[in-house]
């Protein structure tokens, strides 16, 4: 079993926003991947962006530039 690590988890209001996040991150080479929302978090959309904690500032800047609004930003074991 893979050991859980503390990660940055960004949730979204819609699946469209989660998919947009995936597209812009892939295009820009940003850290992270789409995951199902962890059971410890409640969100409107069932998908979340998971990345290393150190990537938080860069990802938030990218989201502002691309007008993607997060529902929540968490640091949790994933």
Give short role names for the model-derived ranges:
Residues 1-2, 34-40:
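Short, flexible, solvent-exposed loop/turn segments with mixed acidic/basic and small polar residues
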Residues 2-11:
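Short glycine-/aliphatic-rich beta-strand segments at the starts of folded cytosolic domains
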Residues 10-13, 51:
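Small/polar loops that bind or transfer phosphate-bearing groups
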Residues 13-31:
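Short amphipathic alpha-helix segments
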Residues 31-37, 71-72:
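A short linear hydrophobic-aromatic micro-motif
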Residues 39-47:
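Short, charge-patterned binding micro-sites
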Residues 50-78:
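C-terminal structural segments of small proteins and small subunits
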């Amino acid at each position: 079993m893979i050991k859980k690590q503390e990660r940055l988890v960004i949730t979204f209001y819609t699946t469209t926003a989660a998919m947009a996040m995936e597209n812009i991150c892939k295009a820009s080479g940003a850290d992270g991947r789409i995951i199902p929302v962890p059971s410890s978090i409640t969100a409107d959309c069932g998908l979340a962006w998971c990345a290393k904690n150190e990537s938080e500032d860069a990802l938030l800047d990218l989201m502002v530039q691309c007008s993607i609004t997060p529902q929540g930003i968490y640091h949790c074991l994933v």
